[in-house]
Design a protein with these regions (language model features):
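Short aromatic/hydrophobic "clamp" motif used to bind/position activated sugar donors
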Residues: 45
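Acidic metal-phosphate-binding loop of nucleotide-sugar-dependent transferases
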Residues: 52-53, 134
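C-terminal subregions of glycosyltransferases and related glycan-biosynthesis enzymes
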Residues: 141, 148, 163-233
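Glycine-rich, basic loop-to-helix element that forms the pyrophosphate-binding segment
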Residues: 24-40
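A conserved acidic beta->alpha catalytic loop
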Residues: 1-8, 49
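Conserved donor NDP-sugar-binding/catalytic core segment of glycosyltransferases
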Residues: 57-89
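Active-site acidic Asp-centered loop
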Residues: 48-50, 76
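Conserved nucleotide-sugar donor-binding catalytic segment
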Residues: 95-181
């Protein structure tokens, strides 16, 4: 779905047999990521969105954590959110410089950001993978599914930069019908994932999802959009 001639730039300036380009019809970010993980030759897959940046030592540092924590199926790191007017360090309180295992469900959205995610392929393949046609929260839904079946490692050092407010970003308008539908899918599939773990589900994830549901309902009320509320109900 890229419109910035990224493939042409890569082909012109980089000649490395480790770089492989796969062409497919634009079916959304979830299908593209699933294809990328499927084609990956290694056991660990580091994700990077086109608008974002890694610190020069990101892969080196994350590789060290992988080597020291082989039982983990997901590796995350803190990030900097850069908007048009300011930058914000996104690190959960008390986790600055922390390096170790975490309970992801204490704060999924602040712990997890796509370009600071390294997946263990064998664990990824045991989940439902990224859900096609979701344009919002598909990344949170995936890392939740992984965290339900494998330990999660977190590095509280901001090693990647998330760029928001970029023209043409799929997530620029959170109030479209497709975006609203994606958020409902996030909640419903998230609860299904939780209940697969046990009869009552994962308690921490259940609490987080109820918190998400409450605030999403308040947001829809504030919009005074009856259609959005009906979709929610």
């Amino acid at each position: 779905g890229s419109t910035d001639n990224g493939v042409g730039i890569i082909q012109q300036h980089f000649h490395d047999n480790r770089i492989r380009i796969f062409h497919q019809e634009n079916q959304g970010v979830s299908v593209a990521r699933n294809r990328g993980v499927e084609e990956a030759r290694c056991e660990y897959v580091a994700l990077l969105d086109g608008d974002d940046e890694w610190h020069p030592d990101y892969l080196k540092i994350m590789t060290k954590h992988i080597q020291n924590n082989p039982r983990c199926g997901l590796f995350l790191c803190a990030f900097i959110a850069q908007g048009a007017s300011r930058s914000i360090y996104c690190i959960p309180k008390g986790f600055e410089n922390y390096q170790g295992e975490i309970n992801l469900f204490h704060n999924v959205s602040l712990f997890g950001q796509t370009s600071g995610t390294v997946l263990k392929k064998s664990v990824f393949n045991r989940t439902h993978r990224y859900i096609p046609h979701m344009i919002y929260h598909e990344d949170y839904l995936l890392i939740q599914a992984v965290a339900l079946i494998a330990p999660v490692f977190y590095c509280g050092i901001p090693l990647n930069k998330y760029r928001g407010d970029v023209p043409g970003q799929t997530t620029q308008n959170p109030n479209t019908p497709q975006a609203e539908e994606s958020k409902l899918m996030y909640y419903n599939i998230g609860m299904e994932d939780s209940l697969r773990v046990s009869e009552k589900g994962n308690e921490s994830l259940n609490i987080y999802l109820r918190y998400f549901l409450f605030h999403d309902f308040k947001r829809r009320l504030s919009l005074k959009d009856n259609e959005a509320l009906l979709r929610f109900i």
